[in-house]
Amino acid sequence: MELNPTEKDKLLIFTAGLVAERRKARGLKLNYPEAVAFISAALLEGARDGMTVSELMHFGTTLLKRKDVMDGVPEMIAEVQVEATFPDGSKLVTVHQPIV
């Protein structure tokens, strides 16, 4: 299977997001990379499901709460950006203050 760099990046995000999802399901608090991966993967999947950029920007703020992550992680993540593929092309999705 031949993948270009963008496809490899998306596969890595998905894999890391899956690990984070499983850890969260076991009740573990997510660290910085896990939290970013969890949010990023959910945004990519939302775009694939047909959500708009504005819907994803709101959706990204509902995924994790302070209780889901280790101390200090919410302050470390001012924003999450991911380039998602939509029916009309790729667009940058930015979620500001994703963990409240």
From Swiss-Prot:
Locations listed in the record: Cytoplasm
SUPFAM superfamilies: Urease, gamma-subunit
GO molecular function: nickel cation binding; urease activity
Spans traversing the lipid bilayer: none
Entry superkingdom: Bacteria
EC number: 3.5.1.5
InterPro entries attached to this UniProt entry: Urease_gamma (IPR012010), Urease_gamma/gamma-beta_su (IPR002026), Urease_gamma_sf (IPR036463), Urease_subunit (IPR050069)
Keywords: Cytoplasm, Hydrolase
Reactions mediated catalytically: urea + 2 H2O + H(+) = hydrogencarbonate + 2 NH4(+)
Pfam family, one: Urease_gamma
A single cellular component GO annotation: cytoplasm
GO BP of this protein: urea catabolic process
Metabolic or biological pathway, per its Swiss-Prot or TrEMBL entry: Nitrogen metabolism; urea degradation; CO(2) and NH(3) from urea (urease route): step 1/1
Subunit text: Heterotrimer of UreA (gamma), UreB (beta) and UreC (alpha) subunits. Three heterotrimers associate to form the active enzyme.
Record-stated family: Belongs to the urease gamma subunit family.
HAMAP family: Urease_gamma (MF_00739)
Annotated protein name in UniProt: Urease subunit gamma
Species whose genome carries this gene: Acinetobacter baumannii (strain SDF)
Taxonomy of the source species: Bacteria, Pseudomonadati, Pseudomonadota, Gammaproteobacteria, Moraxellales
